[in-house]
Amino acid sequence: MPKFAANLSFLFAEVPFPERFNRAAAAGFTGVEYLFPYEYPASEIAEWLRANDLEQVLFNLSAGDWAAGERGLACLPHRQGDFAESVEQALGYAMVLDCGRVHCLAGLSPKGTSSGARLAGVSEAELEATYVANLQFAADRFATIGATVMIEPINSRIDMPGYWLDDVGKGFRLLEAVDRSNVKLQYDIYHAQIIAGDLARTLEANIHRIGHIQIADNPGRHEPGTGEINYPFLFDLLDRLGYDGWIGCEYRPLTTTEASLGWLPK
């Protein structure tokens, strides 16, 4: 059975962030992930992990100015300096937290966004070339500590309008373009269901290129069992395929976090 990590940006939101580590451990989780750690010193987070015997499974590189609507920097030609700084920042946290995976957000396509005016005339080819170069830089930096960089297709229809990497097939093609052994696809089953479906065949054909999995049901992005996705079947499939990585529980509990955990395999 796969290993499940609590996403502390979504789960145990009933309490302040530092207390969520204790709640996750008490609920039986042995690993945690979250969006961003940068509001807290890495040494403090490391102590919360140690105190609760938890593994830091994954976190994101900085997305830029999240409050202003930015959702990553990797595809934006005018932000390459900021991207490089975000890599160094995340590298420092990953070393202190002993974290072997980081997710690199692609960013929003300039078309129709506040940055569009500054990028008028920038082609899709230029965006992709910037993204590939940035991912290669990040991969080479994280290789120095034995860590893997994740790229995640995120649906632009419901959750993140304008997101540049919004197609699963595009994600696999970009892996080939980046051509680094420590860059893998982060396969979020919720997003993948909205983008294209065909979950089982995608997993079967590409499990060797998938380095992390996240889950939520659809519609609603709530816990497994509240929507249309057959998670017991998919968990069995992952076992048959030999997937030994983590599965991040990145869902919004329908009621409380504790009440949402009944789906967890015993």
Task: Give the residues covered by each predicted segment.
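Histidine-acidic metal/acid-base catalytic patches
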Residues: M1-G28, Y38, R50, Q89, ...
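Short, contiguous strand/loop micro-motifs
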Residues: N7-L8, G31-E33, L76-H78, V122-E126, ...
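Conserved beta-strand positions in the central sheet of alpha/beta enzyme cores
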Residues: E33, V57-N60, H103, M150, ...
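Glycine-rich, proline-tolerant flexible connector loops at the mouths of alpha/beta enzymes
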Residues: E33-E55, N60, A106-P110, I158-D159, ...
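Catalytic-core regions built around general acid/base machinery
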Residues: E44-D53, N134-F142, T202, F233-L237
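Aromatic-lined carbohydrate-binding surfaces of glycoside hydrolases
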Residues: A63-D65
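Active-site acidic/histidine proton-transfer and metal-coordination neighborhood
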Residues: L73-K184
